[in-house]
Amino acid sequence: MNKNSGKDYESIQGKIKSKAEIEDSVILDQDTFQGKGEEKTKLDELIRWEAEKNDLLKLIDNVGNDEVFTPVETCQRMLDELFPEDHEVWSNPDLKWLNPCDKNGVFFREIALRLDKGLTKIIPDEYARKKHIMTKMLFSIGLTKFTSLMVRRTLYYCIKANKRKTSEDEGCAIANGARFNNEFGNVVTPYKEHYFGKESKSKNCHFCGTNKNSKYVNSMTEEKYAYDFIHLNSDEYENYFKTNFGVMKFDVIIGNPPYQLSNGSGSDGNGAKAIFQDFVLKAIDLEPKYLAMIIPAKWMISAENIFLNLRDKLKKNKDIKEINIFFDSKDCFPKREIKGGICYFIWQNNYQGKTLINTKFSKKGKSTEIDSSKRNLFVSVLNNTEQIIFRKRIWQDIYTKIDSISASEMKNTHTEREQFRS
């Protein structure tokens, strides 16, 4: 028995308890623990227990005003509602999943757990199954260099996907690095930059509209926030995916895109440019089988021109199978207030049925009412000159009833004001 093992155990236990934050409780640098036999097993159990109790993804809220991390509970609820346990995606080993806007790996961690369960009968060997899921099914584009590291930590337990078991303070990839032969794995570290035209003559980025003089273009800044997924021309995607993933077509696209690019005019987001709609539009253009995203709900009712393309695209193809709308953003992001609420949806290619619309109303974070109905997402109004979304079924019912009354009927039932005059 190692004479230092008991001391190591006590030291590690005290260390984790005193720093129940990020570095020691969830980094999972278990290679630094040299205990053997029963003592090593106890250490492993302690580490796993502490990692679960102090989940890294529950400790970090967000790293900036523009990027809102998805809470673990919200991610789990979104997956459970949009892709129930009996959904085909959990038992199909041939599907390719893409998160084009990964911030911390929460979606793919939860997805990997569900795939591991759903593929048990198809790939009985646990090692082969997990290897297949990690190397052949899940593909991610980090939003920034920092978030790319977080994603690898979450998925591979290591910032370097080919890192083998070591005594260095860098953890280890799943199965000691046997999954990948490169340090990135299936997580791309973003490398695109804002484009201001030939000779940089334009004032704004061609792709996202960022001003040339904004903080995002500062040459001294490590992060450029030129998100790869929306900084590619339409003819560049195939080569980008082939180069980085060896895959050119994705079956399921899922994620929580950055909502805006702040221009510094206000901490509440006033004056900031919304960009989440660009991620949705680009994803639809790739024609996956399924698309699921959680985004601000204001695109449904806002008169801003930047949302017109998204509404027009969705009106045209009618492929949204289900959408969940939350008037209070705190139902999904307890520590954030997002004006206009939040929604998450599942878009299914070539789906032509009605949309299941679930609308949740809350007061002070407590659920008060859920309105659920299957109906057309877009409703024609004003003699079919416009199409709008009624987020509550009763609003649509009231409009339909009023609209069904002809002008003559209105005249016959209308009481003249003059008869009440003296």
From Swiss-Prot:
Has keyword Methyltransferase? yes
Tell me its EC number(s), please: 2.1.1.72
Q: Which GO terms describe its molecular function?
A: nucleic acid binding; site-specific DNA-methyltransferase (adenine-specific) activity
The record ties this protein, via Pfam families, to: Eco57I
Coiled-coil stretches, from where to where?
A: none
SUPFAM superfamilies named among the record's database cross-references:
S-adenosyl-L-methionine-dependent methyltransferases
Q: Name one GO biological process term.
A: DNA modification
Q: Which domain of life is it from?
A: Bacteria
Which residues are the signal sequence here? none
Q: What is the top EC class of this enzyme, as a single word?
A: transferase
List the keywords (alphabetical).
Methyltransferase, S-adenosyl-L-methionine, Transferase
Report the family membership: Belongs to the N(4)/N(6)-methyltransferase family.
Protein's recorded name: Uncharacterized adenine-specific methylase MPN_111
- UniProt lineage: Bacteria, Bacillati, Mycoplasmatota, Mycoplasmoidales, Mycoplasmoidaceae
